[in-house]
From Swiss-Prot:
It comes from Nandina domestica. The gene is TIC214. This is Protein TIC 214. The keyword Protein transport applies. The chain crosses the membrane at residues 18-38, 64-84, 87-107, 124-144, 172-192, 217-237. Keywords: Chloroplast, Membrane, Plastid, Plastid inner membrane, Protein transport, Transmembrane, Transmembrane helix, Transport. Residues 251-264 have a biased composition (Acidic residues). PANTHER family: PROTEIN TIC 214, PROTEIN TIC 214-RELATED. The lineage of its organism: Eukaryota, Viridiplantae, Streptophyta, Embryophyta, Tracheophyta. It is a multi-pass membrane protein.
């Protein structure tokens, strides 16, 4: 079995080797390149389709393969690659070939001279086919500029060793793929030839062949391809060239030269502040030096590549450029780990500079060093430097141990000096050798005089050495020019041109002397001053550079009237036009101008407009109409002429891909950005998809859905709304779609007019002509014609009405976007920018005018549908509703006339129809009556005739007739006679049956039948009448009488019954209707009462039970004082129902949050880890470990210093015999796990401030139950109480004054070294159990006040693995806890237990006061505003016994804050949580570093002297809407009042707040506004804008100053309203009597009065309350101040307390002198001079920070002897030798060189995320400039194998 597995393993390894071999991979990549199909395939196909013979097919195939082979060879052969890879080379080759190709195919007789034979011509054509395929194969890669499959070959080229084999195999693979491809093409062609349908259509085949023969398709294709590529890369002729300056300048003349900028050598450090300003000046002496570098060659093969695809990235604060080159791939060789490797992201500027230097040094070139020698030299140098550093460090320690306090022990910073004797140095602020905390802050950076004074400063502390690098001979420093540059253009804070870089290029003939000048002396590392040793001619040569500051079109328009001459703009901005909509000229002459009110209204308009609109530069297409207002105020004091212009900037609506491109640069492809959300504020790259917590597919918010569902369910009158039918929805969608389509059509038309040359001028003239024609010719002629026609028709003329309507029509000139100006004033540059003509009250010719009385009786619904009373004139004289809209249908003149005629005709027809109908009815009736009469007469006549016959026959008397009647009466049923009232004259008609003669046979039968029928009908009729009468009697209906001839006796009773019935019916209906609501209200009352009673009774019982149970814990406690000390003063009788549920809810969230703590490692940003590791100030102590862990008396290390290391957790004395730790990944992960709770490891002073024991015991009991929050559940209550007792006893005995001092490095040094050195969890500080007693070493946390021998209490450490949310006191959150970092549910546990209401606490955080009766109210966040680096003294005034401090998770940059339920604070049954949510929106605590929340203003002396009146009444704005309707009264007890209200020196009165009246704060406001404006951009200065001292301006400035992390926005409807208001106001400002237009505009809803308030006193707080303005936190990390980046390393000295605090409450100020802001405390003062406050010395501070890191890294990069186990001869000889034995015995466990080196490389270049590299670069290698990111390059390292 083992044998089988062995065989299997061998087979697998063999297969892997075969697969990874160069040949197989080359075949694979070559086969892949088959699929990158280009135009060259078309020629190959054409040769096969045309069937011109096998010769052409063979030649085409040969050319195709030859071209591809040349491309593969060009990968390996550099000259061929240069020739084919350069874009302009291909362009130059293409153009002649295109010309030749065109003539060859269209005019073959040019080449046919008649004497040539056909055979030779055919041969020439075969050669042309070969040439076509060859050349187009070479063109293939530039037609598709970046085909991925072709680039794969280039990528793999740098990974394989045998490059030629790879090229050959990839070419073979490509050949195989193309053979298969051509075989496939042959099969397809064969199928086409065999297909009958294609073969039968001979016409199609012949046409195809003719077109292919004429080859027009390929000529067109070739032409389009060349033009396309010329569009992508600007041709060298058209490109904007650099400015040429021809004359050679001396050094004296250079002071007058302002255009020529100086090349920075700090390019080698990565500063990309190159400038484009000046081109190379040819020096006359060196004209013939490089004669071959002529314009043609540099035009086509310019390796400097001035036209590179670069983007200009602005710094928002200082408007200076950082040229970002991180996205470029640039291959160059660099030395990495002692070996030369190819870096694919090498800085192009460095390679350019290196090649320039190589040209200068061609005389001194030496042989190339082999790679082994290079590596050995690197290893040797590294070893030497490491040993030197170690020796130097140990010597310094020994000197310090001898007791010497000489300042030479400490390593000092190297300063940049100009002259060694005069000691003139750069100021510390500008010294490039000084980084981080050595720099001070600058307040007044921008005045030229102070800048010049700063430059020549004598500093005595600096070292008098001149440190010059190898290139300093070429690049000498010229201070005068440097000074001149400062005077001309102030130096910014951020992207500082380092003073060392200001040099001049000397001429090339001085290159020999350069090497003599650059000889170094290794002992003192100085160089002899060049000016003393050599006489150098002062002929110099400037290097072309990019413009340091490029402006765009908008900035150029803003500064066009400036006095200083500025260069042309270098950036193409968005296509925009500046439209001036109002100009107010105030001159000395009495010119008629607008009133002051009008001007101020215009200014208010422009200010609001500026705030409203945002310029979106990241999207490629901006479909919304964006208009930005800029107010330009130009003052000319000499002329005393002031002109104010209010202008709108109109942007083009089409996608503008030229936007933000540098002129003359290559068009860079935009990065691939996607939007995967429905609403997304910013575009994000898919590279960082893993950083987003929710993707589109998993963004189901279940809680949000439930929330809305239950809200509707539990509402009072909540009903589920039934949506409209689907038809209405579809109609609405169709309507919106149609409106959108029309809007897009209008935009397209306007853009078309805007792009065509001279179209605007033509259109403008046509519009003006149409306006004049309409107003003065067409309409008057129509009026005259109409009235003459009325007079001809004998009607009154309507001259007055028509002329009145004609006069009312106004033709207002508008800008291109429709902003109204006036009737007579044309817009500025209207011929180029465009014009619109708006017709107000357009005249409509009517045939007659109705009286106005008729309008009043109209339906009001019809008035609403009335069209708007304006239109826009089109080019053809039509009317349109909107600019560029479709022409609307004008009301016709004859239409009402035709309607009136139709009405009259209809009326006439109606009358005629009525008459005809009556006549017709009368005739019908007459005919019918006449027929009936005739019939009756005939019947009578026949009857009489029949009787006469009967009488004549029978001669009987007429009595039988009457007898018959009697018989009939008697035959009626007697029973029915009772009910029938027969009138006396009633006649019963017999049926008209002929009476037969008596002697007929059938007479008896017939008579019997007739009698039966009569009886049956009469019986039925009587029964029906009886039934109806019975019904009437039963129902007693009083509506009818039973007998119509007489009134019933009880008729009145029936009427009253009827009324009673109706009333009952109404009441019952009303009761039924109200029954639902009554029942609902009743049930709700019952439900709430019962629920309240049940819950409160349960709550009281549970509380009593808990109190009874907690009494058991009190008996165990003996410390009565601490029991009385801080017990919550909660009244047990008061019952808080809401708070109970809220508390339980927050507990649930608390447990849910903490349950994920131990598994979620991804939320820790590795960049932050490296940031913290870089901040550690203690070096790598592998060499000193034996000394520090020696139990005996140390030789040179005092116990005091050893105690300091013990305090910092660098070592434990117990771990002396443990093995030497190493870098291991499990240690890394353990550290990551422990980092979540590291903030909970507190010192004794922190434990002393724990909450009273009643609360402690209760929380501890809960902690025992909730095992989710605790790692160790085996804690004993008794030990815990002992622990607390000792803690509190110790805290009482501490001195109050020194109790809260902070030691700087105690926490994170320990953490960093724990990570780097430790592996054993047992004795680690992080993994210690909470009640473990460290008996071996007693840590003394207060070094000043205690005698170490007498007082040695046993102290305890608390584990970080236990959630201290169970222990820490949170009561201060309800008061003034100003350092809370983010909003957490844990706060609810404690703030809801006290008497302070939630609303008050929320308003306190926001800065809003709801109740005016509240006496003590401070703007709390104004305190935070002033709590910057220099406000540490303020904290010392607070009484620390009452100000408790909580500890929250300060890693707010990670995902853990996303897991907190911030977004779901608005729970459905607790609307009070909405206030928390709104508070979070206004002031979220998500910023990780305290600096981000602060105003970085240095001078705090004023604020310390000020006191806030604690009883001052203030009405602050209510910023959250949910708080408006609620008010509360707070009982301010004396114990709740803190000293901070009187002592905290936050100048709240100076700062103000958005809602307070700013008029009382004017003096301080002016000062603050001035300070704030100092840091603004140069463009704002160039405007020379007045600082507004008005209330609104001051308030806005203060508001923006406070909420700089937030943005104000409003909804789109408000934006549209404001745009409309601007348009209307622009018109009103120019009218003499604007009242009529204003009223009409308000009636038409054009102008909304609520948006444009008439009063100026409407504050921002009111706007926010009205819902017009919405405060949102800024999602982007906007830099508040340039000083934040420049002095970023100051944060090491004063990081937030939650991060670095272990044993003291407050921090003392460090590294910064508050009085002299431009001077920083020296290192020796910081370490030695302040010994009272800081008795212990961190040894590593002897070295500078850069040398410190160098020592650590060199120790880890220690390569060489493998068997050496970190041995240092200093420690391994003499008395110290025994200390090293314990390390040498464990040699087998450590491969110290290889393993540690590998782990260290994993540490430096981890394979986690790319953006971490930038952070490593910034923080580890001590660079704090963002532009130096290009130095941190990703390199492809070879696979490292551990031997």
């Amino acid at each position: 079995m083992i044998f089988n597995s062995f065989l299997l393993g061998n087979l697998l390894s063999l297969c892997m080797k075969i697969i990874n071999s160069v040949v197989v991979v080359g075949l694979y990549y070559g086969f892949l390149t088959t699929f990158s199909i280009g135009p060259s395939y078309l020629f190959l196909l054409r040769a096969r389709v045309m069937e011109e013979g096998t010769e052409k097919e063979v030649s085409a195939t040969t050319g195709f393969i030859t071209g591809q082979l040349m491309m593969f060879i060009s990968i390996y052969y550099a000259p061929l690659h240069l020739a084919l890879g350069r874009p302009h080379t291909i362009t130059v080759l293409v153009l002649p070939y295109l010309l030749f190709h065109f003539f060859w195919n269209n005019h073959k007789h040019f080449f046919d001279y008649g004497s040539t034979t056909r055979n030779s011509m055919r041969n020439l054509s075969i050669q042309c086919v070969f040439l076509n395929n060859l050349i187009f194969q070479l063109f293939n890669h530039f037609i598709l500029p970046s085909p991925t499959l072709a680039r794969l070959v280039n990528i793999y080229m740098f990974r394989c060793n045998n490059k030629m084999l790879f090229v050959t195999s990839s070419f073979v693979g490509w050949l195989i793929g193309h053979i298969l491809f051509m075989k496939w093409v042959g099969l397809v062609l064969f199928w086409i030839r065999q297909n009958r349908s294609i073969r039968s259509n001979k016409y199609l085949v012949s046409e195809l062949r003719n077109s292919m023969a004429r080859i027009r398709i390929f000529s067109i294709l070739l032409f389009i391809t060349c033009v396309y590529y010329l569009g992508r890369i600007p041709s060298p002729i058209v490109t904007k060239k650099l400015k040429e300056t021809s004359k050679t300048e001396e050094r004296e003349e250079s002071e007058e030269e302002t255009d020529v900028e100086i090349e920075t050598t700090s390019e080698t450090k990565g500063t990309k502040q190159e400038q484009e300003g000046a081109a190379e000046k040819e020096v006359k002496d060196d004209k013939d030096l490089f004669w071959f570098e002529k314009p043609l060659v540099t035009l086509l093969f310019d390796y400097k590549r001035w036209n590179r695809p670069l983007r200009y990235i602005k710094n928002e604060r200082f408007e200076n450029a950082v040229r970002n080159e991180m996205s470029q791939y640039f291959f160059y060789t660099c030395i990495s780990d002692g070996k030369q490797r190819i870096s694919f992201t090498y800085p192009p500027s460095l390679s350019t500079f290196f090649e320039m230097i190589q040209k200068k040094l061609f005389l001194c070139t030496t042989e190339k060093i082999s790679s082994e020698e290079l590596y050995n030299h690197w290893a040797y140098t590294n070893e030497q430097k490491r040993n030197n550093l170690s020796k130097e460090f140990i010597n310094r320690i020994e000197t310090l141990d001898e007791g010497s306090l000489d300042l030479d022990i400490l390593e000092k910073k190297t300063r940049l000096c100009n002259d060694e004797n005069e000691q003139k140095c750069l100021p510390k602020i500008y010294d490039p050798f000084l980084n981080g905390p050595h720099r001070g802050t600058i307040q007044n950076l921008y005045s030229h005089s102070s800048m010049n004074n700063l430059l020549i400063t004598s500093i005595k502390d600096s070292i008098k050495t001149l440190w010059i690098n190898k290139y300093q001979g070429i690049l000498d420093t010229d201070c005068r020019e440097f000074e001149k540059e400062f005077a001309e253009e102030p130096m910014p804070n951020l992207n500082l041109k380092s003073p060392s870089s200001q040099g001049k290029f000397y001429s090339e003939n001085q290159s020999k002397n350069f090497f003599d000048a650059a000889t170094t002396y290794p002992n003192d590392q100085t160089i002899i001053d060049i000016e003393e040793s050599l006489e150098i001619n002062e002929i110099k040569k400037t290097v072309p550079r990019w413009l340091y500051k490029l402006t765009d079109d908008l900035e150029e328009e803003e500064i066009e009237n400036d006095e200083e001459s500025k260069p042309d703009h270098g950036i193409r901005s968005r296509k925009a036009k500046r439209v001036v909509i109002f100009t107010d000229n105030e001159k000395n002459q009495n010119t008629p101008t607008s009133t002051t009110e009008t001007t101020s209204t215009a200014e208010t308009t422009s200010t609001t407009e500026t705030t409203s609109t945002t310029k979106n530069t990241s999207t490629t297409k901006n479909t919304s109409t964006t208009e930005t207002t800029s107010t330009t105020e130009n003052e000319n004091t000499s002329n005393q002429d002031q002109s104010d212009e209010v202008a709108l900037t109109r942007y083009s609506q089409q996608p503008d891909f030229r936007r933000d491109l540098i002129k003359g640069s290559m068009r860079a492809q935009r990065r691939k950005t996607v939007t995967w959300e429905l609403f997304q504020a910013t575009v994000r790259s898919p590279l960082f998809l893993d950083r987003v917590d929710k993707t589109f597919f998993f963004s189901f918010d279940i809680s949000g859905t439930l929330k809305y569902f239950f809200r509707n369910w539990m509402g009072k009158d909540a009903e589920f709304k039934i949506s409209n039918s689907e038809e209405e929805d579809t109609k609405e969608k169709e309507k919106k779609r149609e409106e959108k389509r029309q809007e897009n059509e209008r935009i397209r038309i306007s853009e078309t007019w805007d792009t065509i040359i001279f179209a605007q001028a033509i259109r403008g003239y046509m519009l003006v002509t149409q306006s004049i024609l309409r107003k003065y010719i067409v309409l008057p002629s129509l009026i005259i014609a109409k009235n003459i026609g009325r007079m001809l028709l004998f009607q009154f003329p309507e001259w007055h009405e028509d002329l009145k309507a004609w006069n009312k029509e106004m033709h207002v000139k508008c800008t291109y976007n429709g902003v109204q100006l006036s009737e007579k004033e044309f817009p500025k540059n209207w011929l180029t920018d465009g014009i619109q003509i708006k017709i107000l009250f357009p005249f409509c010719l009517k045939p007659w005018h109705r009286s106005k009385v008729q309008f009043d009786h109209r339906d009001p619904m019809k008035k609403k549908g009335k069209p708007e009373n304006f239109c826009f004139l089109t080019v053809w004289g039509m009317e349109a509703e909107l600019p560029f809209g479709s022409p609307r249908k004008r009301p016709s003149f004859f239409e009402p006339i035709w309607k009136e005629i139709e009405k009259n005709i209809i009326k006439m027809k109606k009358k005629c129809f009525i008459a005809l109908r009556i006549l017709k009815e009368r005739t019908k009736w007459f005919i019918r009556v006449s027929k009936e009469k005739t019939r009756w007469v005939i019947k009578i006549f026949l009857f009489i005739k029949r009787i006469m016959k009967e009488l004549a026959k029978a001669k009987v008397s007429p009595i039988p007739l009457f007898g018959l009647r009697e018989i009939d009466e008697s035959s009626i049923n007697t029973n029915q006679k009772y009910y029938i009232n027969i009138k006396s004259n009633q006649i019963i008609h017999e049926s008209p049956i002929r009476i037969r003669s008596l002697d007929w046979i059938n007479y008896s039968l017939t008579a019997k039948k007739i009698k039966d029928v009569v009886d049956r009908t009469s019986t039925i009729r009587n029964q029906i009448e009886k039934i109806t009468k019975d019904k009437k009697k039963l129902f007693l209906t009083p509506d009818r009488n039973i007998n119509p001839n007489k009134i019933g006796c009880d008729d009145k009773g029936l009427e009253s019954l009827k009324k009673i019935w109706q009333k009952l019916k109404r009441r019952s209906n009303r009761l039924i209707r109200k029954c639902y609501y009554f029942l609902k209200f009743f049930i709700e009352r019952i439900y709430t009462d019962i629920l309240f009673c049940i819950i409160n009774s349960l709550r009281i019982k549970v509380k009593l039970f808990l109190e009874a149970k907690n009494k058991l814990f009190y008996k165990n406690s003996s410390n009565d004082e601490t029991n009385k000390k801080g017990i919550d003063e909660t009244n047990p009788n008061t019952i808080h129902f809401i708070s109970t549920i809220k508390k339980s809810l927050s507990n649930i969230n608390n447990s849910n949050n903490n349950s994920q703590i131990f598994c979620d490692l991804d939320s820790l940003s590795q960049a932050y880890v490296f940031y913290k590791l870089s901040q550690t100030q203690v070096f790598n102590k592998y060499h000193l470990r034996s000394v520090l862990q020696y139990r005996g008396t140390l030789l040179f290390l005092k116990d005091r210093i050893k105690d300091s290391f013990g305090t910092q957790g660098i070592f434990h004395s117990e771990s002396g015999h443990k093995k030497l730790r190493n870098f291991r990944m499990n240690e890394w992960k353990n550290w990551l796990r422990g980092r979540y709770h590291y903030q909970y490891d507190f010192s004794q002073t922190r434990w002393s401030r724990l909450v009273p024991q009643k609360w402690r015991n209760r929380i501890h009991q809960r902690c025992m139950v909730q095992t989710k929050n605790s790692t160790y559940s085996d804690l004993y209550e008794k030990d815990q109480l002992i622990h607390y007792e000792k803690q509190n006893n110790y805290a009482v005995e501490l001195n109050q004054k020194d109790k809260f001092k902070n030691y700087k490095y105690d926490k994170y040094d320990r953490l960093s070294h724990k990570y780097i050195h430790y592996e054993d969890k047992k004795d680690s500080y992080i993994y210690r159990s909470p009640l473990q007693v460290n008996e071996a070493k007693e840590f003394l946390y207060n070094y000043n006040t205690y005698n170490y021998s007498t007082y040695n209490p046993k102290l305890f450490f608390m584990s970080g693995d236990i959630s201290l949310n169970n222990y820490l006191r949170e009561d201060s959150d309800t008061e003034k806890n100003l350092d809370r970092k983010y909003f957490d549910w844990k706060i609810f546990n404690f703030c809801l237990r006290t008497k302070i209401d939630i609303e008050y606490w929320t308003n306190m955080d926001i800065g809003a006061n709801v109740n005016k009766k509240t006496k003590t109210q401070t703007n709390y966040y104004q305190i935070i505003d002033k709590k910057d680096l220099f406000s540490i003294a303020i904290h010392k005034q607070i009484n620390p016994a009452k100000q408790t401090k909580t500890s929250f998770d300060w890693m707010a940059m990670n995902e853990e804050i996303l897991n907190c339920p911030i977004s779901n604070l608005e729970l459905w049954f607790f609307p009070e949580f909405v206030s928390f949510y709104n508070a979070y929106k206004i002031q979220p605590w998500t910023i990780p570093i305290n600096l981000l929340l602060l105003n970085f203003n240095g001078n705090e002396n004023v604020s310390e002297k000020q006191n806030i009146n604690g009883k001052e009444k203030k009405d602050l704005p209510i910023l959250s809407k949910s708080n408006q309707k609620k008010s509360l009264e707070l009982k301010n007890k004396e114990e709740k009042k803190k000293p901070a209200q009187e002592n905290i020196g936050s100048d709240t009165q100076k700062q103000g707040n958005p809602g307070s009246d700013p008029s009382t704060q004017q003096k301080d406001i002016k000062k603050n506004v001035k300070e704030d404006y100092d840091g603004r951009s140069d463009i704002q200065k160039r405007k020379k804008k007045k600082q507004s001292t008005g209330n609104i301006a001051a308030e806005l400035d203060l508001f923006l100053k406070r909420y700089f992390l937030f943005q104000l926005r409003w909804d789109n409807p408000l934006n549209k309203k404001i745009i409309n208001n601007v348009k209307v106001y622009c018109l009103l400002l120019r009218l003499k009597n604007p009242k009529e237009i204003a009223i009409a505009s308000i009636q038409r809803d054009e102008m909304s009065l609520d948006v444009m308030p008439i009063s100026k006193t409407l504050t921002l707080a009111k706007l926010i309350n009205k819902g017009m303005l919405i405060i949102e936190p800024a999602r982007l990390s906007i830099k508040r101040d340039g000083q934040f980046l420049l002095y970023q390393t100051i944060t090491i000295s004063r990081v937030h307390k939650n991060k670095h605090q272990t044993n003291q409450r407050y921090q003392e100020k460090r590294n910064v002198d508050k009085n002299g802001l431009e001077k920083s405390i020296a290192r020796h003062e910081k370490l030695v001079g302040n010994r009272d406050k800081n008795p212990l010395l961190v040894l590593e501070n002897i070295l500078s920070s850069q040398r410190r890191r160098e020592l650590r890294i060199r120790i880890c990069l220690n390569s060489g002897n493998v068997n050496v186990v970190d041995r240092n001869p200093v420690f391994c000889n003499g008395n110290n030798a025994s200390n090293c034995d314990q390390f040498l015995n464990e040699e087998r466990h450590l491969d110290i060189d290889t393993n540690k080196f590998l782990k260290f490389k994993l540490l430096l270049w981890p394979n986690y995320r790319l953006e971490d590299l930038a952070c490593i670069n910034r923080y580890w290698f001590d660079t704090n400039n963002g532009s130096r990111f290009s130095m941190s390059r990703i390199r492809m390292y070879p696979q490292l194998r551990i031997s």
